[in-house]
Amino acid sequence: MSALPFPHLSISLHTAAILTGRSVRTWQRRIEEGLVPRLGDGVRALVPFEAVQQSMEGVPGEAANAWSAQDVQTLVRADQGEALAQAQMGSQFALLALRGAAPATPPAPGHDAGRIAHYFLERAAEQAQADAMHWLGLLYAAGLGPAGDASDADADNNAMALMWIAKAAAHGHAIARQQLTALLPNLPNLPAGGQA
């Protein structure tokens, strides 16, 4: 391996699998074969971000050199369960997915920005992160269900979009409140509060 640009940053095998499209078992096997160093925090197996970065090289929109030091630090915090960092990572991949929602060349297998966005946004939403809920609503409204592509049924996507936007509004997300009011004008005024 050459000099590592992010020498002490590591992520879980599961997050490595999500980002690269390689299975957790593949990452375990690469560790067993000595191809990737196994790091640990005492609780879970971790791999250096550089190993994940090398596995992502050549993937449009997610190329290894597209990661700034700040992006990697946010990724590490998201992997550790920080809701705001999960929402930030999810929103970055959601933007990639939404830009690619129009008919275009499909992403390489396993490197689907929509699927990665759902992974991080769902974890942040489980922690009541309103921005993550809103982003999930936007993904579903664009026809991008958890598979990350437009193959899901439109009715299901529309229902999920409405549900996530309503949840974001209930958690105080200002834009989601306005969207919900525009969709359902006969609703009583939604209370302000929560997080925006």
Map each language-model feature to its residues.
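Polyanion-binding surface elements
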Residues: 1-24
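Short helix-start
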Residues: 10-12, 31, 35-62
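Short helix-capping/linker turns of helical repeat alpha-solenoids
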Residues: 34, 80-83, 96-100, 127-130, ...
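Structural signature of tandem alpha-helical TPR/SEL1-like repeats
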Residues: 64-73, 99-120, 146-164, 189-195
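Hydrophobic face of amphipathic alpha-helices that form TPR/SEL1-like repeat modules
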Residues: 88-100, 138-143, 182-183
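TPR/TPR-like (Sel1-like) alpha-helical repeat modules
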Residues: 155-175, 181, 185
